[in-house]
Amino acid sequence: GGKGQIEEFLRAFNGEGIQHIALICDDLMACWDRLQQLGVPFMTAPPPAYYAMLDERLPGHGEDAEALRMRGILLDGSTEAGDARLLLQIFAQPQIGPVFFEFIQRKGDEGFG
């Protein structure tokens, strides 16, 4: 199997350092729209199959899958017992050497995505 992102970072940059900076947003779609207007480049979006499988993976998530797909926003969390605990996230391309920004919106999920 492949190495995880932390192992890859350590190898590529010869040791420890800051990989990314996470910023929380109240409305990630509006945040993405504004950042896009400002010319912030984002990492490549997942394939369409990722969004096609959201309803199966997180039934009853209540998010607009097409709006997420158009922006490349990732959706994670759980919807067990009808209680949607979600994390929306997107990553900008590296801006400061290897450091990149992560933009997240938490809707009850406190995990890492």
For the regions a protein language model found, what residue spans apply to each?
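Glyoxalase I/VOC metalloenzyme domain signal
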Residues: 1-113
